[in-house]
């Protein structure tokens, strides 16, 4: 069973967001990293780039597949985790900690209401056979 921290919100595309004021820290879930297998390459936007909820903001490549990353919210990228670009396996090892991807200044907090609670995300995982 995948780990689903209770202090995060989730997207149906298996991204998570931790909200701290108007800043959102975004990464992929434990389920996503397990599904991908060993991650070998990550492409992320640059600081200052604008991202839009539901749109692709990067790519994660594993030995099995390449998968787009989808923004759970809209906003401006204020920090990129350079460590995961240099050491992509951090996402496999610690998807909710050292494996975070980007930090964004959230431009529309109402979009957070569209995301899944931990309980709803667990139901989604059950539907997907987790």
UniProtKB/Swiss-Prot annotation:
Residues 23-105 form the Lipoyl-binding domain. Keywords: Lipoyl. It comes from the Bacteria. The modification N6-lipoyllysine is found at residue 64. Coiled coil: none annotated. Its cofactor is (R)-lipoate. InterPro entries: 2-oxoA_DH_lipoyl-BS, Biotin_lipoyl, GCV_H, GCV_H/Fam206, GCV_H_sub, Single_hybrid_motif. Binds 1 lipoyl cofactor covalently. The keyword Iron does not apply. One of its GO terms (cellular component) is glycine cleavage complex. GO terms for biological process: glycine decarboxylation via glycine cleavage system. Belongs to the GcvH family. The glycine cleavage system is composed of four proteins: P, T, L and H. The glycine cleavage system catalyzes the degradation of glycine. The H protein shuttles the methylamine group of glycine from the P protein to the T protein. This is Glycine cleavage system H protein. The gene is gcvH.
